[in-house]
Amino acid sequence: MFPLKKSLLLLFFLGTINFSFCEEERNAEEERRDDPEERDVAMEKRVLPLVGNLLNDLLGK
């Protein structure tokens, strides 16, 4: 019975370490996706057309 418990404990420990590495990698990928420059470019793409349309409407062109 003791060798079985020891094996299960070892598997649990290794699985926990593996899960921790996967979580760190996932967090690193999310940080890369949330790059501030990319967010600024996305914001410009959304805001500039709206501002352009608003100016066109105000100026009557």
Swiss-Prot record:
Residues 23-44 form a propeptide. The modification Leucine amide is found at L59. Antimicrobial peptide. Residues 1-22 form the signal peptide. GO terms for cellular component: extracellular region. Expressed by the skin glands. GO terms for biological process: defense response to Gram-negative bacterium; defense response to Gram-positive bacterium. It is found in: Secreted. The keyword Signal applies. It comes from Rana dybowskii. It comes from the Eukaryota. This is Temporin-CDYa. Belongs to the frog skin active peptide (FSAP) family. Temporin subfamily. Pfam families: FSAP_sig_propep (PF03032). Keywords: Amidation, Amphibian defense peptide, Antibiotic, Antimicrobial, Cleavage on pair of basic residues, Secreted, Signal.
